[in-house]
Design a protein with these regions (language model features):
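Positively charged n-region of N-terminal signal peptides that target proteins for export
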Residues: 1-4
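Bacterial N-terminal signal peptides
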Residues: 6-15
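Sec/Tat signal peptide C-region and signal peptidase I cleavage site
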Residues: 16-20
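An alpha-helical repeat/solenoid feature that recognizes helix-turn-helix modules
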Residues: 22-27, 41-71, 88-130, 137-182, ...
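Primary recognition of N-terminal secretory signal peptides and signal-anchoring hydrophobic helices
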Residues: 27-34
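Short, Lys/Arg-rich amphipathic segments at extreme N-termini
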Residues: 34-41
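Short, Φ-rich (hydrophobic/aromatic) sequence segments
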Residues: 35, 187-188
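Eukaryotic RNA-binding helical-repeat scaffolds
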Residues: 74-79, 83, 222
C-alpha cells in the first residue's frame, strides 16, 4: 500500500511539473478558470442568455471539459437553456443586440458540442436544426444584422455564420445531399476570399471537399494565410494589419483542420511548414493572455473595449489551443 501511495504521489508530482512546464496547458487552465466564473454571470445579472457567454464561451468550456479540464457546474444553467430550442425565441436581448439569427447559430453551435460529448440529447439538436434551416436565406447563406463586416468574435461575418450553421446541421444528422446543405455549399463556393478572416472561414467551410471550385478556393485561402502570418506568429484581419487573437485563433483552427490531411494544404505548405504555422500561431495566442485568464478582445476597429467581444475572443482562443 505504501509503495502504491508513493507511486501515485510521484505520478501526481510529475503531472503537476509537466503542466507547469507546458505554457499551453497553463494558458488553457487559466482561461477555463476565467470562463467558469464569467459564463454564469451574464444570466444572473441580466434578463437573457447571451451569444457570447452562453454561445461562444459555453462551446469552449464544453470542449475543455471533454479534454479533462475542470469546468465544475458552470454550464448547468446554460445547458438547461440550450436543451430547449423551442424557448430560444423567448430569450430577449437588448434591442440593439437582439440578432435572432446570430443567437440561433451560436446557441445551436454550443448545443452541437454538448450533444457530441453526451451533455444533450440528439433530439434537442434536431429541434435546433429546424430553427437553423428556417433562418437560411434563399441564396443558401445565413445573414446577420452585421454580416457585411469582416467579422468579429461575437458578430460573425456571413461566411462564418454559414459555416457554423452548416456544421451544426451536419452534426444533427442532416446529410450532405439535403437541399439545405446543397444550397449552403453552393453559396460558399460563390464567395470571393479577400482577407484572412474569410480565408480561415473558407477552409473550415470546405472541409475536405475535392471538387474543382473547392480546390480553387482552398488554394486562394491558403495563399492568404501563408503570406498573412506575422513574424510573431499571429494573423490580423488583413495580411498587412497587426495580429489579433481572434483572427489568429480562427487561422489556427482552419490550418489544424488540414493537418491530418496535409495534401489539402500542399499548394502553400509542406507538412512540416503547416505544423510550424499552427505551433507559432498557438504560441502567439498564449503570449497574449492576460493575467486574469482572459484574452484581449478583438474588435472592429481594433483596440476598443467590449465585454462581449472579450468573452467571445477568450472562447475562440481556448478552442484554438484545445484542438
Amino acid at each position: 500500500m505504501r509503495l502504491l501511495l508513493t507511486t501515485t504521489a510521484a505520478a501526481l508530482v510529475l503531472s503537476i511539473v509537466g503542466s507547469a512546464q507546458d505554457p499551453t496547458a497553463a494558458a488553457i487552465t487559466k482561461g477555463v478558470q476565467y470562463l467558469t466564473v464569467e459564463v454564469p454571470k451574464w444570466k444572473a445579472g441580466h434578463s437573457c442568455y447571451s451569444c457570447h457567454n452562453n454561445g461562444d464561451a459555453a462551446r469552449a468550456l464544453l470542449a475543455a471539459g471533454a479534454k479533462g479540464f475542470d469546468i465544475g457546474t458552470s454550464l448547468d444553467d446554460t445547458l438547461a437553456f440550450l436543451k430547449q430550442p423551442a424557448k430560444w425565441a423567448q430569450n430577449k436581448a437588448p434591442d440593439q443586440f437582439d440578432d435572432r439569427t446570430l443567437a440561433t447559430i451560436q446557441f445551436a453551435g454550443a448545443l452541437a458540442v454538448a450533444e457530441r460529448h453526451g451533455k444533450a440529447a440528439s433530439t434537442d439538436l434536431e429541434a435546433a436544426a429546424k430553427l437553423l434551416a428556417a433562418a437560411q436565406q434563399a441564396d443558401g447563406s445565413w445573414q446577420l444584422d452585421d454580416s457585411h463586416s469582416v467579422g468579429s468574435p461575437a458578430a460573425y461575418s456571413a461566411l462564418i455564420a454559414t459555416w457554423s450553421a452548416r456544421t451544426s446541421l451536419i452534426a444533427s444528422g442532416m446529410q450532405p445531399d439535403n437541399f439545405t446543405i446543397v444550397q449552403a455549399d453552393r453559396w460558399i463556393r460563390g464567395v470571393t476570399v479577400e482577407h484572412v478572416v474569410d480565408a480561415s472561414a473558407m477552409l473550415l467551410a470546405l472541409g475536405d471537399a475535392g471538387d474543382v471550385m473547392a480546390e480553387n478556393l482552398r488554394r486562394a485561402s491558403l495563399s492568404i494565410l501563408r503570406t498573412g502570418q506575422a513574424p510573431t506568429g499571429g494573423w490580423g484581419p488583413q495580411a498587412a494589419t497587426a495580429p489579433q487573437v481572434f483572427d489568429t485563433a480562427l487561422a489556427v483552427l482552419a490550418l489544424r483542420s488540414l493537418e491530418s490531411e496535409p495534401r489539402l494544404a500542399r499548394s502553400a505548405y509542406r507538412p512540416e511548414q503547416l505544423t510550424d504555422a499552427i505551433a507559432t500561431g498557438r504560441k502567439y495566442i498564449v503570449s497574449q493572455q492576460r493575467q486574469d485568464g482572459s484574452w484581449p478582445e478583438t474588435t472592429r476597429p481594433a483596440n476598443h473595449a467590449s465585454y462581449a467581444q472579450r468573452i467571445s475572443t477568450t472562447g475562440w482562443a481556448l478552442l484554438a489551443l484545445l484542438q
